[in-house]
């Protein structure tokens, strides 16, 4: 690779530790799925689906500024150098786990409570391959420490628009959610 960039390769394993594929080349994965840096939030993404049908503004709750697609989906890649910065959406968002290492997802609710979910395939150890995040919930994610990469998907309905995205303020979250200080520091810029 050019510019001294290190080529990363990992072997994917199933729950029994057996190889299930050829070594994963992260740069190749980015090219194959046309993944680009996700502005403000972090990680890499590519929109994989956007419904061609639209909901008129008058059919939506007041929190939406205009018409919206019925739904959208993206691929989302996390690496050790990236994280999904704390943010919230005006729509529900569902995470889907596809490949790689477990991901820690911090969710902070409006009532002041919060929870850290682990997205992955080891169900015996409390991981979930799918997590639904309700609208208005502050959320951010990172690879579990020691992880090499994770390929996820997210689905949003009504469909995602950047106008529906709000990046969190670190000081505000620290004041409101003192039980999650370490993760808030990790997942904010």
Feature annotation, model-predicted:
Residues 19-20:
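Short, positively charged and aromatic/hydrophobic N-terminal segments
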Residues 13-14:
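Polybasic, lysine-rich low-complexity intrinsically disordered segments
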Residues 23-131, 140-141, 146-148, 158, ...:
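Non-catalytic, conserved peripheral segments adjacent to functional cores
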């Amino acid at each position: 690779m050019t510019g001294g960039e290190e080529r990363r390769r990992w072997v994917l394993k199933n729950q029994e530790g057996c190889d299930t594929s050829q070594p994963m080349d992260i740069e190749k994965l980015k090219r194959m799925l046309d993944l680009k840096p996700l502005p403000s939030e972090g990680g890499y993404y590519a929109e994989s689906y956007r419904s061609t049908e639209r909901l008129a503004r008058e059919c939506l709750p007041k929190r939406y500024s205009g018409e919206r697609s019925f739904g959208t989906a993206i691929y989302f890649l996390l690496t050790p150098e990236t994280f999904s910065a704390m943010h919230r959406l005006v729509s529900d968002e569902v995470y889907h786990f596809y490949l790689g290492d477990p991901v820690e997802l911090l969710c902070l609710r409006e009532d002041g409570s919060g929870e850290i979910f682990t997205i992955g395939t080891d169900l015996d150890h409390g991981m979930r391959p799918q997590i639904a995040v309700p609208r208005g919930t502050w959320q951010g994610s990172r690879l579990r420490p020691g992880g090499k990469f994770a390929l996820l998907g997210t689905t949003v309905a009504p469909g995602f628009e950047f106008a529906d995205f709000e990046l969190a303020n670190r000081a505000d979250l620290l004041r409101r959610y003192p039980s999650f200080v370490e993760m808030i520091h990790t997942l904010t810029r």
